[in-house]
Amino acid sequence: MSVSPVSIVSTPVAVSESPAGSPVQPAVPVTVRWRGSEAYQTSFDAMRAFTDTRTADTGDEIWVVEHPPVYTLGQAGDPAHLLVADSGVPLVKVDRGGQITYHGPGQIVVYLLLDLRRRKLMVRTLVTKIEEAVIETLAAYNLASVRKAGAPGIYVASGVHEGAKIAALGLKIRNGCSYHGLSLNVKMDLRPFLAINPCGYAGLETVDMASLEVAADWNDVAHTLVGRLIANLDGESAAADKPQALEHSND
């Protein structure tokens, strides 16, 4: 069954007066597009085209997608971090920051197409908001996770898999607008990570929520994550009706 993209929009709040009398900035609307299972190159070309053609009036968008198996290598990435040249998984060189990572079924990928100038966001602040959204999402499933200084992404906080990476992050900023985004491992085949130095770190363990004994539904986690992203970007709670479920596979 194919699933058509569905859009939901977070409603901006009205400008009001704070107790100190200074205006409170309204939330900036963002359209969430659920793109289903999509080839990485298709998403990559689409987000570049969206960013290249957007104007000051173009609305912000968040895209949620699941990719067939693919390795992506950041613009300053070292191909030597791909340890097995004939793995059968394609490699795509991209223009985001960071090194090499893997995308595949059972992983949530979220692309953030945001006008940072309009949102008055510094890149470091955006990264912090994204990381916090992932930490909050995992906490909703009773999983403790942390940031690591100098190593963008989210890592398991304690237990047998302490220090293992569960979410990756990489952005590109062009003309004050972001694209690319983050990936969160829910329930996937983790073996392709063994063929790379994930994010350029030799021997870095990569896990998913299933590895941590959380039997989470992909769609439920995706909606929790998107809700937290919107709330953090807006600086307030944000809720939206769930669109129809995406067709995806954890095989």
UniProtKB/Swiss-Prot annotation:
According to UniProt, this protein's pathway is: Protein modification; protein lipoylation via endogenous pathway; protein N(6)-(lipoyl)lysine from octanoyl-[acyl-carrier-protein]: step 1/2
Pfam families recorded for this chain? LplA-B_cat
The top EC class is: transferase
Residue numbers annotated as active site: C199 (acyl-thioester intermediate)
Q: Per the record, GO CC terms? A: cytoplasm
Q: Name one GO biological process term.
A: protein modification process
Q: Please give the superkingdom of this protein's source.
A: Bacteria
Q: Which GO terms describe its molecular function?
A: lipoyl(octanoyl) transferase activity
Q: Which reaction does it catalyse?
A: octanoyl-[ACP] + L-lysyl-[protein] = N(6)-octanoyl-L-lysyl-[protein] + holo-[ACP] + H(+)
Q: Keyword set for this entry?
A: Acyltransferase, Cytoplasm, Transferase
- Say which family it is in: Belongs to the LipB family.
General function of this protein: Catalyzes the transfer of endogenously produced octanoic acid from octanoyl-acyl-carrier-protein onto the lipoyl domains of lipoate-dependent enzymes. Lipoyl-ACP can also act as a substrate although octanoyl-ACP is likely to be the physiological substrate.
What is the name attached to this protein's record? Octanoyltransferase
Q: Which organism is it from?
A: Burkholderia ambifaria (strain ATCC BAA-244 / DSM 16087 / CCUG 44356 / LMG 19182 / AMMD)
